[in-house]
């Protein structure tokens, strides 16, 4: 699922399925998502995306999540010059989104899904502000140009947020949804990194950027092992929402009690000291193989397998239809309609 699995992790703190996309196969399930939880705290919710609403079954599963608004490609000027790869380029996407964002009733919870910095990383010459890399692998070479283009589009959007007054009144989370370059590009990545792009290095390349802006908080770098499954608990705590009664597999990244264990969907995992990659153990700090699996490592492997099994049970059995925390009202998907409309007030549901 990649992107769709990432959204499942972000919105629900549930893992994707071992096969297929839960967005497609479990699109009618009951969920206790970020948009539903925050909606019952008075937040208007919206998704902005420069592709069409049916992609990844978003037009159906977002109703199960309780999203008030979904601004898909039908809301944007999809002229040929501004469309590339999977949809609208990031710069016109953010620019055209400003009007819709400003029309939302505050407070709001919104999500922007960008497209330009996505495999195979095509970019028009007029949009590239830096030279490509020179590995001879076109996808690796243009990756950096599309990343720079994304950076420039985000800067322009942040400038708008500051000018409009939203920046100083918003928690902003920026993250990557999945890896950029797969292990099929080993030779080119070896040239880029200046070292062998082996199994261990490929696992490290699964890391994605995560930046959190909180008004009034001094910026800095926090060294922490975590995954996308931890984003929802972190966001809820930043907004003062108690998540103890919700079924979530992640923990608050900013808490002293955060568990520094990152499960992969295939049962592999990473910790600050050791990792299991492809069933083999490695020293996480040096990348050196570990010949003998210790008792602690075996217990960690079993813990990861159990956590994935429990998450699968929730999705496969649609178990959240049987449970809701006190005070939480289950989402009624029939209230939501994402056909293009003039008003974006949440009362139009």
Region annotations inferred by a language model:
Residues 1-349:
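Solvent-exposed soluble domains appended to multi-pass membrane proteins
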